[in-house]
Design a protein with these regions (language model features):
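Ligand-binding clefts of soluble mixed alpha/beta catalytic domains
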Residues: 1-197
Length: 197
């Protein structure tokens, strides 16, 4: 970006909707460690609806591998810039920032994030209310309408969950600014990592 090397990580919504599988988590851990070893700032174009769920995910140890990937992200000393393109839900969706040095988070207006997407989450969270209603479909629509009013990305931006909601057309120039800003932070030397789960 603007002549500076960076490590670019992006989600693939065509593979499991962008959800993190055990294999994805292992790739993320290795990628982040490699970028950190070579002092490359990380740019993450995030579209992650969370960890993959189900019997196969359980058998493959998705959560165990996910904790290791998130530990790698959190331990990273290299600067980090995330752009939430679309989805950032659940624990895996929250894995878009490091725990240390310089970290900037942008979101497109299309970005949606939180602990659980409304689609599918409403039935789980409001099952008793929906079942007790005379008209379950109407109750479901009422709950969806109420929650959709709270879903705006501007609410999260106002509480500083992200730094700025940006026009997608400005993304490259913002990322170039990021690369130039963090260039002086590149320091040669050994990266030490703590133990991971």
């Amino acid at each position: 970006l603007d002549g500076w090397p960076v490590a670019l990580m992006a989600s693939d919504p065509f593979s499991y909707g962008g959800g993190w599988t055990a294999d994805t988590c292992r790739k993320v851990e290795k990628f982040v460690d490699t970028a950190d070893t070579f002092h490359l700032p990380i740019v993450y174009l995030a579209d992650c609806p969370g960890f993959q769920i189900g019997l196969e995910a359980e058998k493959n140890g998705t959560i165990k591998e996910g904790v290791k990937a998130m530990s790698a992200i959190w331990q990273t000393a290299t600067p980090w810039c995330s752009v939430i393109i679309r989805n950032a839900f659940g624990v895996a969706g929250a894995a878009h920032k490091n725990g240390g040095r310089y970290c900037t988070r942008y979101a497109w207006p299309s970005g949606r994030w939180g602990s659980l997407p409304l689609e599918g989450g409403i039935e789980a969270a409001y099952r008793a209310d929906i079942d007790a209603a005379d008209d379950p479909d109407a109750k479901m629509a009422e709950i969806e309408d109420r929650l959709n009013k709270l879903r705006s990305p501007f609410r999260s931006a106002e509480t500083f969950w992200i730094e700025e909601i940006v026009d997608p057309r400005d993304t490259r120039s913002l990322l170039c600014d990021f690369a130039n800003t963090v260039a002086p932070l590149r320091e040669p030397g050994l990266r030490l990592r703590m133990m991971r789960p």
